[in-house]
């Protein structure tokens, strides 16, 4: 489990096509400290497994389904990525519960800067819209954010300077893809309510 609090901006140093998968080598001095084979690291919100680890770099294999459902397929050598290690039992939950299972992708639609923050509008797949509410949580490229406005096919978030400086969202431009993970609690509530309604018939 992750919290959506990005630990560092990493960098893609190599991409190898394996046919039905891709192998990424990524640099991240913070997240690789003490890393072991089989550990999980979230890369732009996607939970990946460490295959190899050497120095401040690690490699991870990404299956075709993950490449299809996320924006990882758009990464190339030199791309910056948000990195986070799983949260430890008993540690603070600084953001919200993030599984690292991307629900879909959106696109940055617009950026509106102001004196102290920036409003970013992101497109939202129709099948995810019901899980996104104003003041609720959403994960964008692995970053736990609070929804400012929820529309039928978009939402907006407000980014403070720290988020702009320390994550990829400070660099994303209109048209760039982002990974989206909706709040898992909303999905559980929907499933529970569906079961209750079915039992009452």
Predicted regions span which residues?
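Conserved loop->alpha-helix
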Residues: 1-201
């Amino acid at each position: 489990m992750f919290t959506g609090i990005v630990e560092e901006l990493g960098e893609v140093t190599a991409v190898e096509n394996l046919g039905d998968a891709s192998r990424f080598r990524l640099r991240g001095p913070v997240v690789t400290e003490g890393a072991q084979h089989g550990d999980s690291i979230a890369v732009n919100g996607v939970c990946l497994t460490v295959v190899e680890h050497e120095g401040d770099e690690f490699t991870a294999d990404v299956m075709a389904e993950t490449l299809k459902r996320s924006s990882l397929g758009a990464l190339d050598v030199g791309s910056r990525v948000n990195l986070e290690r799983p949260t430890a039992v008993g540690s603070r939950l600084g953001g919200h519960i993030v599984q690292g299972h991307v629900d879909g992708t959106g696109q940055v639609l617009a950026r509106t800067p102001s004196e102290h923050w920036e409003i970013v509008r992101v497109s939202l797949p129709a099948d995810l819209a019901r899980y996104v509410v104003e003041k609720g949580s959403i994960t964008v490229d692995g970053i736990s954010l609070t929804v400012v406005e929820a529309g039928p096919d978009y939402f907006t978030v407000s980014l403070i300077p720290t988020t702009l400086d320390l994550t990829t969202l400070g660099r994303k431009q209109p048209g760039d893809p982002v990974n989206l993970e909706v709040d898992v609690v909303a999905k559980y509530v929907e499933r529970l309510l569906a079961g209750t309604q079915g039992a009452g018939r």
